[in-house]
């Protein structure tokens, strides 16, 4: 058997063994995709014992390409929500998550200086302790750029594997410990979160209001201050028994009922100006109007603003809200449409059908992947990651590398959505498949390279010490920030658990947090809020630590 055939066969075996290990769960908690790393270590040990020779060049290419696939698909997935998560609504959560990253970096630096841990080893421990595989890839690349021998670079994968298991278990232990310390009642926390979300959250709500302000009588909607912007949309108007779709020129009268869509604070302001909320239904049932959700799949409308499509003027149809990547938005007239946007349309059936034809509304297209944008994005990401940034006093130029470059480019492209007929939307199933393939390839190679000396290091070497160092890097930041978030910020426990899981980019921890109260979405929401920024910081941090430690000796 040729070296290439043998290498592919061994990688397939690693994937099978590793995925089997990852699927084994104890009380609902397992290693997940991290099991591939340990599958690689097991197979790598026996490959070394048998004296087999694998193609080192092929392993290197597969490792790097797997990492690129993984970080690129992550960026495409979270790109639409990344910049939104940095705004005020998620600012507090992101600040606490950033604090966890900073404290973790400080603990790593202290351990490195106190115990004189070799640079590749301490970076591997850091990456494993925070269960972040792209950090491992970024750290290995910067070490190679600094001229570190390959044997030392491979030690990073071994120390990563030592610290990884407690990285998984440590966050679960922290959640449990914080629950005991603060005597948390999970049911109460879930109710409080739901109450806060309903009353003051930044979610999109609807309300029916009667026009009671005499100053608004015979005034066009476009002349009513609260309705002439993009914060509140009036999607239906009922006068006596007639329900209609209003336009900006529609004149309102005292006693009219308006169906408004917007965020709670803006709807409250509308009540103050227009009149009181009423229980009267403005449902389209029994009328010649209907409400329908339509998906944007026509390349010809991508990038166009809602106002430029003139749906109200041409078809008498109003867009009441927009769902983008799972986030509900007010359909501002300045919003540019992206592939996969889901629009709530209100109008007559024939008019809605006409608008649907303009927008596309071809569900089958959502299951198709445009491969050209995928490779354009990956190519641009690799180029971005290869740009050197020279910092005075540093021994090597800083680069985003093959982990950071594709991630940043994917975040940007995911946010842009489309350029002409090229769109960077990727169906969730396709995104997940490519992401899982990438991480399996990467971890398989890392495990294979670490397997030869793993048992010796664990039994006769410093493996146990590395596990202890990793436990500190995992636990100290989580416990510190958890206590601060609960005591000072009075953060909801379920929200805090999601934030802690997101700060470690740890899906098993999110699954554990979700199971604390399966019907509450608090943990998942906070996890998604901090995940994009933290993933970026986790990739950059080992590079900064490597250059810092290298420069100060």
From Swiss-Prot:
Q: List where in the cell it is found.
A: Cell membrane
User: What GO terms are given for molecular function?
Assistant: monoatomic cation transmembrane transporter activity
Q: Name one GO biological process term.
A: potassium ion transport
Q: In the UniProt record, does the keyword Transmembrane helix occur?
A: yes
Q: What parts of the sequence cross the membrane?
A: 4-24, 28-48, 65-85, 95-115, 158-178, 371-391, 393-413, 439-459, 464-484, 493-513, 533-553
Is Oxidoreductase there in the keyword field?
no
PANTHER family, A to Z: K(+)_H(+) ANTIPORTER SUBUNIT KHTT (PTHR30445), TRANSPORT PROTEIN YIDE-RELATED (PTHR30445:SF3)
Which family does the record claim for this protein? Belongs to the AAE transporter (TC 2.A.81) family. YidE subfamily.
Name of the featured protein? Putative transport protein YidE
The protein's organism comes out as Escherichia coli O127:H6 (strain E2348/69 / EPEC)
